């Protein structure tokens, strides 16, 4: 939990959360209650919304939106060792998919790729198909199937204890939308009623068909005037003949929409998705003069133009503040 000074610095006071109630060495059994495609249209990717009943286990009623849980796939790896736990973001509100905290869900993308050399010792001619063990196991499960689960995990990438004290900018790429689905539901559809906070979600994808939970999010935006849903499609040609760009390009182009939000004392920023998003967003904040509430830049980088930052220097010299929550992979 943050210190009492948070009330004076506009930092969020985070709630106490349960963690590691179910360790990987002693998983519990959940049961799949739903598995459905959650993409807007036909795509080169395969992403499923998978719901798991954890009633009667320590996970029941113990997780919060923004946390993660673990899945242990059956079988052994190439060393004949049991597969290790894989973590997945919880895509459900704190009250669960069922409203009682008994069913949690995640947003799982199948990993399907070709082998490619990553070290000088790897076989350069190898190009056979590689399929992710846990993602495909999880996506293959059918309603009624049992699955070993652990968790919950995570204490910082959560909503503040008093959500109404803050406004929100959520930035997501791909399956990074998962925790925001739950958080936005908590903010707008929680038991205490919708908050009046200003809430913006920016979702970045390669193609329109890659949008996740699009119908649900648009319905929420239509119903709640304080919730604004923005999509950024990077590889499709826009009406003006240009490509859509990435999230940081969108923020730069639409700064007139977000400058007031970002400069406000109440605003919290959450980023979730591919790690490549982090550099562009941090550069945008610094370049626009909006970085102070969200970034701590070490002296080594303070006199360097943000456009000259690279991933290595950023990781070494830029840290998010308590008002910037980061979950990238």
What are the roles of these predicted feature ranges?
Residues 75-78, 150-156:
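Short, charged beta-turn/beta-strand-edge "cap" motif at the junction between a beta-strand
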Residues 148, 167-171:
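Conserved beta-strand elements of the Class I
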Residues 33-141:
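Ferredoxin-reductase
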Residues 160-165, 263-265:
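Short helix-loop-beta connector
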Residues 69, 147-149:
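Generic structural signal for buried aliphatic residues
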Residues 144:
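Active-site-proximal polar cores
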């Amino acid at each position: 939990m943050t210190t009492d000074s948070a009330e004076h610095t506009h930092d969020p006071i985070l709630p106490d959360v349960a963690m590691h109630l179910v360790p990987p060495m002693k998983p519990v059994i959940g049961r799949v209650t739903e598995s459905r495609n959650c993409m807007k249209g036909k795509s080169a990717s395969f992403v499923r919304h998978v719901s798991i009943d954890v009633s009667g286990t320590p996970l029941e009623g113990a997780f919060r939106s923004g946390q993660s849980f673990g899945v242990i796939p059956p079988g052994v790896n190439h060393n004949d060792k049991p597969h290790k736990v894989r973590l997945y973001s919880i895509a459900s509100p704190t009250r669960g998919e069922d409203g009682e905290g008994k069913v949690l869900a995640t947003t799982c993308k199948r990993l399907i790729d070709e082998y490619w050399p990553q070290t000088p010792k790897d076989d350069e001619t190898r190009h056979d198909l590689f399929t992710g063990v846990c993602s495909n196991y999880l996506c293959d499960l059918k309603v009624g199937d049992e699955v070993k689960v652990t968790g919950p995990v995570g204490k910082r990438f959560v909503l503040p204890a008093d959500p109404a004290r803050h406004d929100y900018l959520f930035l997501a790429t791909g399956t990074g939308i998962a925790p925001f689905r739950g958080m936005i539901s908590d903010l707008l559809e929680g038991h205490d009623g919708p908050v009046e906070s200003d809430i913006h979600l920016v979702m970045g994808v390669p193609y329109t068909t890659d949008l996740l939970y699009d119908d649900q999010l648009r319905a929420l935006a239509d119903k709640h005037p304080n919730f604004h849903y923005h999509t950024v499609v990077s590889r499709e040609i826009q009406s003006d003949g240009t490509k859509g760009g990435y999230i940081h390009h969108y923020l730069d182009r639409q700064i007139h929409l977000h400058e007031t939000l970002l400069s406000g004392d109440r605003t919290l920023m959450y980023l979730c998705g591919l790690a490549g998003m982090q550099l562009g967003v941090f550069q945008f904040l610094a370049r626009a003069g909006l970085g102070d509430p969200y970034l701590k830049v070490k002296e080594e980088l303070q006199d360097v133009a943000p456009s000259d930052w690279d991933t290595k220097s950023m990781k070494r010299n830029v840290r998010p503040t308590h008002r910037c929550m980061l979950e990238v992979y």
